[in-house]
Amino acid sequence: KGFSVLMANSLMFQRFPNHDGYDDPSFSSFYGQTLPLMKDGIPVEIVHMENLPFKQTLADVKVLIMSYSNMKPMEERYHQMLVDWVKNGGALIYCGEDIDPYQQVPEWWNKSPYAYHSPSEHLFELAGLDRKPAAGKYTVGKGKIQVIRRDPKYFALEPDGNKVFKECVYSLYKEVSGEKVELKNNFV
């Protein structure tokens, strides 16, 4: 227990099958964040971004996995809430290359007073990181941000495409909880 994937209401807005050479077949970016863990018997909970203002939303989360490859934040305030959670000891894994065409949709992150190429740049800047941090693990306050520069769809679509993802998730979980992840083929 303690693994969650961040979802936003905008998740279903990005359902165009192929645009400018970018595709996310069969909801793969979402499944890429959940199925690799579930196949190892790890229950994964969903956290709705729009529920972040409620204090209890992240109370039991040890590792929060997110990507803007398949959704976008509707409001900038959610980023400060995520950063505050990390600074207080939370562990956030961000997966993505930030290259899908929806990054350029006219929205708050690329309108005045901002000029970000993707909403993740705003998140990382609030965390005190470079706007486009390289893949790696970063200490932010008492917590950690792990950046995986790969779209999560590849964790579901490619054979062994989830190896690095699972290594990062399980390693970060052990680091923040002090517990080893128990892998199994069931949820009991």
Feature locations, PLM:
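A conserved amphipathic helix/loop scaffold
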Residues: 56, 72-188
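An acidic- and aromatic-residue-enriched active-site/binding cleft used to recognize and process polar
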Residues: 8, 49, 68-69, 97-99
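Carbohydrate-binding surface patches
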Residues: 2-22, 26-31, 67, 72, ...
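Generic, well-ordered alpha-helical scaffold segments in large soluble proteins
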Residues: 36, 40, 67, 85-88
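Short, well-ordered secondary-structure micro-motifs within conserved domains or adaptor modules
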Residues: 58-70
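Aromatic-Pro/Gly-enriched surface loop or interdomain linker
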Residues: 1-61, 141
